[in-house]
Regions:
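Hinge/capping helix and adjacent helix->loop/strand transition within the periplasmic-binding protein
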Residues: 1-13, 22, 77-81
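A local structural motif
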Residues: 3-17, 31-33, 117-118, 155-161
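Residues at alpha-helix termini
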Residues: 5, 48, 113, 152-153, ...
């Protein structure tokens, strides 16, 4: 994001300021001038007049993959049917929330996060375009994510994406639920 706006790392001080409420508190207290933060805190900053959304990370690095469900080797090997049922249910709920129960979801989530429904609606609507309707991880995005992580020194050069993930269960969930790859539409 800095590079895309002509700012070098030498022009800023990078601070590990936590996440969620902690990162939001560093912004509202003036401890930091800017932060990368998840919603609803970005929307909350605008609503409270303590900050402005300057950009979304995925607009700068759209191939960076962040949405991940992780399972242990044990459950994959010993209880794959349980994992499959979980993923089927997860993606079924995902689709129903997005397409049938959106307002109820906003009400529930606002209560869980202790923010107003207006703030939560803005937070979710600001990000709804990146809610993937297809659970299968595109291999090229995984490769690109690994490249980014190596480029910025967050991942050892010897680490490869191959063998670190599986689409087996996501493919079965997509088939079971009738979800189609948006790239094929």
């Amino acid at each position: 994001m800095l590079e895309a706006n002509g700012i070098s790392e030498d022009e800023v001080t990078l601070v590990a300021n936590g996440k969620h409420q902690t990162a939001y508190a560093t912004l509202t207290s003036g401890e930091v001038d800017a932060t990368i933060i998840h919603n609803p805190y970005a929307a909350l900053a605008e609503a409270e007049g303590t900050g402005h959304i300057l950009g979304r990370a995925w607009d700068y690095i759209p191939d960076y993959y962040t949405g991940t469900i992780v399972a242990s080797d044990r459950i994959i090997k010993e209880e794959p049917e349980k994992l499959q049922r979980f993923l089927n249910a997860y993606y079924e709920v995902h689709e129903k929330v997005k397409n049938e129960y959106f307002d109820e979801f906003i009400t529930w989530l606002a209560q869980q996060m202790d923010v107003s429904e207006d703030v939560m609606r803005k937070a979710v609507e600001d990000e709804i375009d990146v809610w993937s309707d297809y659970p299968v991880i595109p291999e090229d995005r995984v490769e690109k994510t690994v490249e980014y992580l190596k480029e910025y020194g967050w991942l050892d050069e010897n680490v490869q994406a191959e063998g670190t993930y599986t689409n087996e269960f996501a493919e079965k969930a997509a088939e079971t639920l009738g979800l189609t790859d948006p790239a094929e539409k």
